[in-house]
Amino acid sequence: GLIAYFPEPSFITKNDLALDCALTIRRLVYDGLNPVFEQNDYPGINVRIGLDSGDAYVVTIGSPATKSHKDIIGSIVSLSAKIQSLGGSGDILLGEVTERNLHTMWREICEEIELKKDWKYKGMDGEPYKVYKVKFR
């Protein structure tokens, strides 16, 4: 797994940057790495990506006397993982906040997905938190 953290230059810009990064990772894996793996009789790898926006904090776990490490914590980290788990191979899924704050050109390639009945996450309005999928041609 991989967690990417996009700190502020601006809230809106970081949503666009996060989606651009996700599209680049997907393209690199499926158009760059997998063809080379397959030519050498290795299985390709699959990725699915979940994005959302909100407060996250970079913290140091441990002390200088021990092997400390950095981690990213916050409810948004857990929600992004839950969003990612809804996808299939090659999918890029976005939470409602991320989709709403994307530039129009990015929003045009996203469509809301139907959520399973066991999806428990609610938005600020008390309604089920929406999830969007990036459409590929």
For the regions a protein language model found, what residue spans apply to each?
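Intrinsically disordered, glycine/charged-rich C-terminal tails and inter-domain linkers
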Residues: 89-137
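Serine endopeptidase catalytic core focused on the charge-relay Asp
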Residues: 25
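Catalytic core of nucleotidyl cyclases, primarily class III adenylyl/guanylyl cyclases
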Residues: 1-14, 33-73
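Conserved, well-folded catalytic cores of nucleic-acid-processing
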Residues: 28, 32, 86-89
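Short amphipathic C-terminal alpha-helix that caps PH/PH-like domains
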Residues: 21-22
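Catalytic/regulatory signature loops of cyclic-dinucleotide turnover enzymes
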Residues: 52, 75-100
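Solvent-exposed amphipathic alpha-helical surface segments
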Residues: 29-36, 105, 109
